[in-house]
């Protein structure tokens, strides 16, 4: 049960950080410099 809870928190934290990173990199994403990350 503890392992499942840790797994859930890990997945949730991953998606939250991924969403925040995508939201923050959305503004400079319109710049030509964004092509370097792809």
From Swiss-Prot:
One of its GO terms (biological process) is photosynthesis. It is found in: Plastid, Chloroplast thylakoid membrane. The keyword Chloroplast applies. InterPro entries: PSII_PsbI, PSII_PsbI_sf. It is a single-pass membrane protein. One of the components of the core complex of photosystem II (PSII), required for its stability and/or assembly. PSII is a light-driven water:plastoquinone oxidoreductase that uses light energy to abstract electrons from H(2)O, generating O(2) and a proton gradient subsequently used for ATP formation. It consists of a core antenna complex that captures photons, and an electron transfer chain that converts photonic excitation into a charge separation. Keywords: Chloroplast, Membrane, Photosynthesis, Photosystem II, Plastid, Reaction center, Thylakoid, Transmembrane, Transmembrane helix. The chain crosses the membrane at residues 4-24. It comes from Ostreococcus tauri. GO terms for cellular component: chloroplast thylakoid membrane; photosystem II reaction center. Belongs to the PsbI family. PSII is composed of 1 copy each of membrane proteins PsbA, PsbB, PsbC, PsbD, PsbE, PsbF, PsbH, PsbI, PsbJ, PsbK, PsbL, PsbM, PsbT, PsbX, PsbY, PsbZ, Psb30/Ycf12, at least 3 peripheral proteins of the oxygen-evolving complex and a large number of cofactors. It forms dimeric complexes. This is Photosystem II reaction center protein I. The lineage of its organism: Eukaryota, Viridiplantae, Chlorophyta, Mamiellophyceae, Mamiellales.
């Amino acid at each position: 049960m503890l392992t499942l809870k840790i797994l859930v928190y890990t997945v949730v934290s991953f998606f939250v950080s991924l969403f925040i990173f995508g939201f923050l990199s959305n503004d400079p994403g319109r710049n030509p410099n964004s092509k370097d990350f792809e």
